[in-house]
Amino acid sequence: MSHIKFWRQTLALVILSTLLSACGVNNLPTYDEQVKSSWSQVENQYQRRADLIPNLVSTVKGYAAHEKETLTEVTNARAKVGSIQVSKNLLENPQAMQQFQQAQGELGSALKRLLVVSERYPDLKANQNFLALQSQLEGTENRISVARRDFITATQRYNTEIRTFPGKLWHSFLYSDMKLREAYTATTEDAATAPKVTF
């Protein structure tokens, strides 16, 4: 009799563990790692952009020395981005994340102004080094956009898992230390307003 009881318990345990593994008990840690990984890609692309800036500024400076204000803006924006401590805790701190996003937005705006200024200098636009840097910067901006999109998608998947069944159940029992992630906004406040174009 006890032999049958043992096999029933063993069978119940095997069935229960199979059901648990099939119904999403590991989704939250998996999605959390995807959020962290996708954020690392965003950081990598931001670093790539920051690494291009000194060469770009030096090249423009040689041709447009009297555009000192714009060059200073770009340099200061890069310094501001560099002064923000980026760590794994940035994802856990919405205020620090907001500061980081704002600094990156300011840097992006300063770079756009620099490229607009460069349009006034035909010799600069013909410089092969400048053209190569401009192309690399454009490619990096595209990579940043893709990395942001992937991060937003991973964050949404993670947050949805915490808010819906059965993820909500697993969250309350096993992963209560995992918090909802702050929604990432990759746009500036004025992005919703269409720019005026006049000819």
Predicted regions and their residues:
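A helix-centric hydrophobic-segment signal that preferentially recognizes long
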Residues: 2-199
